Amino acid sequence: MARARGRGRRDLKSEINIVPLLDVLLVLLLIFMATAPIITQSVEVDLPDATESQAVSSNDNPPVIVEVSGIGQYTVVVEKDRLERLPPEQVVAEVSSRFKANPKTVFLIGGAKDVPYDEIIKALNLLHSAGVKSVGLMTQPI
């Protein structure tokens, strides 16, 4: 009888304790949430090297090249003429006048390697607002 009062058999718990598992999962979730914006902001764009490029024929129509040399810095090149450091409005006016003079003019956009790709997109939008429907991208940096 003394045995039953003092030292009874303890029942073992057969449940799984998931609190440590949840702690680890929440810490991992916080780490991923903190690093996800950093990963998406640091994506670098490497321009491909074109192995099969087509040469632009300049028999009758010399190509009009819009060079993006920096943020908001545009240069329009037609044959030997270089119009440097043009504001976006003047680029649109120059491209529009060239396009209206000859709709078959070839337009190319080139950018320096250190220029953010967003500036190339802005140059594409400028040519689109000037009425140009087809634009080529130069694969060799300027």
Curated annotation (Swiss-Prot):
Coiled coil spans: none
Any one Gene Ontology cellular component term annotated for this protein: cell division site
Null allele phenotype: Mutants lacking the tol-pal cluster suffer delayed outer membrane invagination and contain large outer membrane blebs at constriction sites and cell poles. Tol-pal mutants fail to complete division and form cell chains, and fail to process denuded peptidoglycans at the septum.
Periplasmic topological segments: 39-142
Transmembrane found in the keyword field: yes
Location of this chain's protein in the cell: Cell inner membrane
Superkingdom of origin organism: Bacteria
One of the GO biological process terms: protein transport
Alphabetized Pfam families for the sequence: ExbD (PF02472)
Cytoplasmic topology ranges: 1-17
TM annotation in the entry: 18-38
Topological type in the membrane: Single-pass membrane protein
Note: There are about 900 TolR molecules per cell.
Quaternary structure and interacting proteins, as annotated: The Tol-Pal system is composed of five core proteins: the inner membrane proteins TolA, TolQ and TolR, the periplasmic protein TolB and the outer membrane protein Pal. They form a network linking the inner and outer membranes and the peptidoglycan layer. TolR forms homodimers. Interacts with the N-terminal domain of TolA and with TolQ.
Family, per entry: Belongs to the ExbD/TolR family.
Stated role: Part of the Tol-Pal system, which plays a role in outer membrane invagination during cell division and is important for maintaining outer membrane integrity. Required, with TolQ, for the proton motive force-dependent activation of TolA and for TolA-Pal interaction. The Tol-Pal system is also required for polar localization of chemoreceptors clusters. The system also appears to be required for the activity of several outer membrane-localized enzymes with cell wall remodeling activity.
Protein name as annotated: Tol-Pal system protein TolR
